[in-house]
């Protein structure tokens, strides 16, 4: 390897002659008894019998030349090194420039020789890299979790979503209009010249320092927006709604302090209080069971069912107070009585209102050209058309419900309605669809 390492075409890559300090050209002499470091001499110094310190002219020597084959009888070692250097300089596959740099071989010969001896050569099949790959192949394959990542939103210019995102451009990671957008105007007339007085020079430097502080404030605001995920305001609000009302109030209060702490610390603080609220509510529920003398969850389910029944009976007993407000209007009173009769017969109020309104149902939504349509399968497209929900909003609602389901180990309809504040009928259809397709599970 030492011998091959000295076969470079560039004379400056070789060690100089110890006698005349000139660059060595092949053939040259290497002393077999001196070294390390190796002792090299050019032919002129060798023929003069040059001696230096411990080196004597009668030492055994070795003639260094690359005029011998290594891998192919028609290729010398010097040509092998020249080929590797040319591939390194010109790039793999650029065989015409490789041949031009070598000057002794055609591009076909260079490509054939390189592919045969350096790519497909079985001699290099037992390299350290291949051995590591073989050892890794013996190990059992482990599943790598894959989470699909949504592309950053790219709303059309001057659209509602673009205005909600403050003109943020995801491809450039920047805003169309910067914070303090006209800060550079204060510098447009400043010019440092040698004739400035000390006071004028200090004044100009103060203006530049103020400009730097404004730039720092601009970058600080950008960092807060990116770190806390405030670019997509709709998604941010959707994530906020997954908390109970009490935690949402705390979230709103603590939002102004988010810039002081990091995003992870802020989220941990909110999550810890959300967990505290859930624990307090669960403790209160268990205390209610204990007050009622219940000691197991089987009896607790019966207690909840009976409690719900009592609440429904209490509402029915108060219906008389409701009908009194319609007593002066006979048509309104008749309509109320029919509605109560239908409710008693098992019809839901939503079905009743739809049948009594007499209005035609809205036509299916046309999804052509709407952003996010290509990310939906056929069943999801049909759902969005029937529910009249744009694909972008559906994908956000779906992502929020999936995250909450994975976090809680299941999802109830009441939780879904608290999470996405839209029409309850649409929420029910989305919830039933995700349950039916296996995206989420019931709690």
From Swiss-Prot:
Pfam families: Myb_DNA-binding, SWIRM, TADA2A-like_3rd, ZZ_ADA2. This is Transcriptional adapter 2-alpha. The keyword Transcription applies. The modification Phosphoserine is found at residue 6. InterPro entries: ADA2-like_ZZ, Ada2/TADA2, Homeodomain-like_sf, Myb_dom, SANT/Myb, SANT_dom, SWIRM, TADA2A_B-like_dom. Coiled coil: none annotated. Disulfide bonds: none annotated. PROSITE patterns: SANT (PS51293), SWIRM (PS50934), ZF_ZZ_2 (PS50135). Changing residue 429 to A: Reduces DNA binding. One of its GO terms (biological process) is mitotic cell cycle. Keywords: Chromosome, DNA-binding, Isopeptide bond, Metal-binding, Nucleus, Phosphoprotein, Transcription, Transcription regulation, Ubl conjugation, Zinc, Zinc-finger. One of its GO terms (cellular component) is nucleus. There is a cross-link at residues 132, 138 (Glycyl lysine isopeptide (Lys-Gly) (interchain with G-Cter in SUMO2)). PANTHER family: TRANSCRIPTIONAL ADAPTER 2-ALPHA, TRANSCRIPTIONAL ADAPTOR 2 ADA2 -RELATED. It comes from the Eukaryota. Interacts with GCN5. Interacts with NR3C1. Associated with the P/CAF protein in the PCAF complex. Component of the PCAF complex, at least composed of TADA2L/ADA2, TADA3L/ADA3, TAF5L/PAF65-beta, TAF6L/PAF65-alpha, TAF10/TAFII30, TAF12/TAFII20, TAF9/TAFII31 and TRRAP. Component of the ADA2A-containing complex (ATAC), composed of KAT14, KAT2A, TADA2L, TADA3L, ZZ3, MBIP, WDR5, YEATS2, CCDC101 and DR1. Interacts with CCDC134.
């Amino acid at each position: 390897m030492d011998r091959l390492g000295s076969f470079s075409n560039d004379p400056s890559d070789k060690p100089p002659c110890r006698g005349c300090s000139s660059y060595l050209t092949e053939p040259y002499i290497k002393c077999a008894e001196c070294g390390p470091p190796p002792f090299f001499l050019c032919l002129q110094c060798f023929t003069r019998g040059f001696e230096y310190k411990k080196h004597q002219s009668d030492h055994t020597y070795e003639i260094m030349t690359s005029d011998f084959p290594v891998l192919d009888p028609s290729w010398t070692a010097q040509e092998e090194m020249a080929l590797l250097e040319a591939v390194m300089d010109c790039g793999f596959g650029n065989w015409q420039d490789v041949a031009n740099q070598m000057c002794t071989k055609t591009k076909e010969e260079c490509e054939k020789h390189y592919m045969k001896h350096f790519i497909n050569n079985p001699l290099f099949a037992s390299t350290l890299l291949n051995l590591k790959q073989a050892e890794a192949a013996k190990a059992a394959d482990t599943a790598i979790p894959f989470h699909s990542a949504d592309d950053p939103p790219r709303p059309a210019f001057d659209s509602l979503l673009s205005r909600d995102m403050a003109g943020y451009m995801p491809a450039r990671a920047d805003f169309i209009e910067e914070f303090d957008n006209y800060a550079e105007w204060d510098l447009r007339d400043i010019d440092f010249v040698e004739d400035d007085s000390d006071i004028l020079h200090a004044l100009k430097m103060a203006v530049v320092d103020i400009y730097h502080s404004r730039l720092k404030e601009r970058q600080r605001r950008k960092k807060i927006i990116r770190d806390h995920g405030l670019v997509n305001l709709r998604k941010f609000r959707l994530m906020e709604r997954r908390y109970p009302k009490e935690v949402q109030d705390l979230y709103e209060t603590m939002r102004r302090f988010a810039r002081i702490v990091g995003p992870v610390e802020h989220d941990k603080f909110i999550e810890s209080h959300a967990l505290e609220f859930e624990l307090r509510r669960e403790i209160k529920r268990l205390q209610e069971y204990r007050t009622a003398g219940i000691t197991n969850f089987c009896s607790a389910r019966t207690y909840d069912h009976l409690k719900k029944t009592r609440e429904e009976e209490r509402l029915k007993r108060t219906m008389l107070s409701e009908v009194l407000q319609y007593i002066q209007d006979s048509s309104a009173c008749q309509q109320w009585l029919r509605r109560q009769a239908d409710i008693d017969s098992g019809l839901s109020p939503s079905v009743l209102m739809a049948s009594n309104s007499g209005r035609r149902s809205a036509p299916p939504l046309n999804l052509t050209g709407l952003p996010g349509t290509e990310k939906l399968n056929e069943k999801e497209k049909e759902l969005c058309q029937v529910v009249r929900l744009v694909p972008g909003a559906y994908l956000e609602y779906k992502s929020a419900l999936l995250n909450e389901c994975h976090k809680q180990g299941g999802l109830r309809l009441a939780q879904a309605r608290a999470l996405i504040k839209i029409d309850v009928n649409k929420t029910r259809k989305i919830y039933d669809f995700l349950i039916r397709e296996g995206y989420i599970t019931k709690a």
